[in-house]
C-alpha cells in the first residue's frame, strides 16, 4: 500500500497530475460517502453507514474519519473548478458526505467533527457568522438523528459502562506496557492472546488498539511513536510554510488553499485516528507526500531566486502559462 505513496513523490510533477490525484482520492472515498448520505436520509439515520468490504475503511468508524479527511479536498476542488455543474455536484457531495458521517454513528467521528469545526472557526475571518452557522447546522442534524444515535453519542460520557470503550483502554495499557518492556515494540503481529496474557491488565480482552498512536506504540515502541509524531509534525510545518509563502501572492492562491485544506485533513486524521487503527492507512500518507511536494517546490524556488508564481499549483492566467512547471521535481 505504501508503495503508492512513494510513487506520488516520484510521479506528481505538475498541477495537472496533482489535481488528478486529488480527484482520484475524492472520488474513491466520495462514492461511498455520497451514497451513504442518501442512505442515511432515506432511513432516517436508523442504520450505520459502512465502507467497502475488506478494506481499511470497511467499518463505520474508519469510513467516517476517511470522509472527514476527504471533505476538505472536496472544498479545494469546489473552489478551483471553473465549471458550474462540477461545482454543483461537489456541493452536493459535501452535503451528503457530512450526512454520512453522522449516519456512521461513530463517536470518534463526532469528536473529529468537533475538532475540525473548531479549527475552521478558529481560522475563519467572520467568527460570529461562521459560529452561528455551525450551531444552526449542528442543531438541525441533532434534531434529525434518531434516539439510538443520541444514546450512542451520550455513551461517551459513561465510557466506564461501555465494554467496547473499556476494551480499548485495556489495549492502550497493553501498548504502554509493551513499549516500556521492548525498546522497538513487539512488531506488527503482536496483538495476540499470548502477548495480552503477558502485558495486558485484562488478558481476556484481546482487542486491537483502535488508536493510531497506541497502535504504533505497541508495534514500534517509543522510538517508533516519536518518529510517527515527527512525520505528522513535519507535514504540518511544511503546509504552514507554504501558507506563509503564498499568503500575499495572488498567483499562488490555489497552493495556499490546498495547503490550508490539507491541514484540515490532518486535523481530522489526528483527532479521529486517536480512536481508530488507521496508522498504516494510505490516505494520510498521500497527504503527507503532497505536503512534501508543495513545500519542496516553494523552498527550492526561494533558494534559486525564482518567481513563486510558477509553483506546482499556480493560479492559471492563460493556457500557455497554465502548465509552466513541467520541470521534474525530485522527491524530498
Model-derived segments and spans:
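Alpha-helical transmembrane segments of multi-pass inner-membrane proteins
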Residues: 1-7, 13, 17-49, 55-123, ...
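Long extracytoplasmic/lumenal interhelical loops at the membrane interface
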Residues: 46-54, 157-173, 177-220, 241-255, ...
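Loop-to-transmembrane-helix entry motif
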Residues: 60, 122-125, 220-224, 265, ...
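Hydrophobic transmembrane alpha-helices and their immediate junctions
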Residues: 129, 220-266, 286, 290-291, ...
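Transmembrane alpha-helices of multi-pass inner-membrane enzymes
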Residues: 135-136, 234, 264-322
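Membrane-interfacial, low-structure loops and terminal tails that flank and connect transmembrane helices
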Residues: 241-257, 303-332
